[in-house]
Amino acid sequence: MSTSDHSVAPASFAVSVPDVPDAELEADDLDPDQIVSGDPVVTGKVLWESPDGKQLRGIWQITPGVVTDVEANELFVVVSGRATIEVEGGATLEVGPGSACVLREGDKTTWTVHETLRKAYHISY
């Protein structure tokens, strides 16, 4: 399924997230101001987008390093890798394979990625 025309994805589908080759993931440039340390690289693939663009489902991957972000409403499951996610004014989340996480819109986070992390996500705006 092509990310350039992900709107044609069926409402119900399955994908083996660990088996999607890195070559099928698209570069997602980080704002240099988000990088705290290291040289992290972000890639991903949108598998489905709602017609109004307010919901996305896909795969996201980041290599080791430390980055900051302001989150959307998101549910994700870590497929591989490890990271520590510090939520400003909130919890510190240690995540690894099988971790299911919820982030709220507006959460300010710092991601310390220890091992290249891949997740399957659902985001709503």
Positions of predicted regions on the chain:
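A short hydrophobic beta-strand segment most commonly corresponding to one strand
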Residues: 102, 109, 115-125
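A short, N-terminal "cap"/entry segment at the start of jelly-roll beta-barrel domains
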Residues: 1-54
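Residue-level recognition of conserved beta-strand positions in structured domain cores
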Residues: 59, 71, 87-89, 113, ...
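Short, conserved beta-strand element in jelly-roll/cupin
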Residues: 62, 70-85
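Conserved short histidine dyad/triad with adjacent acidic residue
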Residues: 49-71, 104-105
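Short acidic-glycine-tyrosine-enriched beta hairpin
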Residues: 89-106
